[in-house]
């Protein structure tokens, strides 16, 4: 299909709390045109992120899904391409200019859902500078309900000479600023999983070299080796009248190192999700960090507990709330520390009739110094979305959001 159209997304992004973030935040793709066929180019390493095609003037797209093969090809001319440089402890971003973008993926379907695939992505800036990525990936069953999922990415970047990123820092021996340097990097993700009716286990090894960047992906951290073990147990009731309709328990352990071998993180997470009778849901999570290394500061033995509940008394009403309390590392380059954190919020949906739907959310967060309880940050995000469907062809949407962290009010109205 050839498309020259309005590429705007259906709904504005829900703002995330970024008061203590050093890496760029991931926002999911919401534009219908770019979402179509995204399962073919899905990447465990986010080697492809179609939102990196930010403001397309025109695009051509081809999707083929057959019994033996799947093909995805997309080309676009972007009027305002973003630029993201990954780092070990933080990422750097800037607004670029016009660029040509291209994504091609071929997947060979084997027996029993196995597959092998190749992919290339390319971006060429009109004023100079380009990036190339090549990927090999696959899913192979190796018996006894064991699956091997792998992905290898190789990138070659020729930076533009631009002032889009203002930084004097270095990463992997190269400058972060865009001064025409050439970089090559690689990423590797290997997942071994085994599952039956009630149990599933997954081992994950992920690696990002110090200069790994993806021209049309979302790589906000590199110089990383990560080892993850995940175990899940699931139970279903024998009767629809049982108090508990679904139960899952999860345990996950994480070990992170940089490529030089310095330990960056060690922690475990235990969580559970319960679906109760009469449309009530509960989730709990306990995180324990043995150690975390940020810019040479090593925080040890801190904990966070979180819980959420959701209730749907009818199809017209959904209400929920969450909270999280514990300890958190304050990511300040000059004075990092462990602080006392607290987050809470609510979310609800009301649909009084078939035409009108109202959604509201409020999220509060704060972090305090453990010694004197002085504030590192404090604020909240409040958002409401009103949808009114006049008929099958006409609808109205009004979004209002207030960000108390930045004292900003955002409003967006749309007719579709």
How should each PLM-predicted stretch be described?
Residues 55-57, 131, 151-416:
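Exposed, low-structure sequence patches enriched in small/polar residues
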Residues 2-255, 287-291, 300:
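Outer-membrane beta-barrel channel domains
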